[in-house]
Amino acid sequence: LTCLICPEKYCNKVHTCRNGENQCFKRFNERKLLGKRYTRGCAATCPEAKPREIVECCTTDRCNK
């Protein structure tokens, strides 16, 4: 599985996940409309969202756009 890993909205940096990491995730704060920063990467399980945070998980290559 390969996941995107950069914080910008439009991301092209790809990372190959390790064994056991079978999900890509994207995490961001729902309140910041301008200058939104994303946390992207690989995970074994979908990370839990903190208050006012959105976490999206998926299981195909580069799906965490």
UniProtKB/Swiss-Prot annotation:
One of its GO terms (molecular function) is toxin activity. It holds the Pfam family Toxin_cobra-type. It is found in: Secreted. Keywords: Disulfide bond, Secreted, Toxin. The keyword Nucleotidyltransferase does not apply. GO terms for cellular component: extracellular region. Coiled coil: none annotated. Expressed by the venom gland. Disulfide bonds join 3-24, 6-11, 17-42, 46-57, 58-63. Gene3D superfamilies: CD59. It comes from the Eukaryota. Belongs to the three-finger toxin family. Ancestral subfamily. Orphan group II sub-subfamily. Binds with low affinity to muscular (alpha-1-beta-1-delta-epsilon/CHRNA1-CHRNB1-CHRND-CHRNE) and very low affinity to neuronal (alpha-7/CHRNA7) nicotinic acetylcholine receptor (nAChR). This is Weak toxin CM-11. The lineage of its organism: Eukaryota, Metazoa, Chordata, Craniata, Vertebrata.
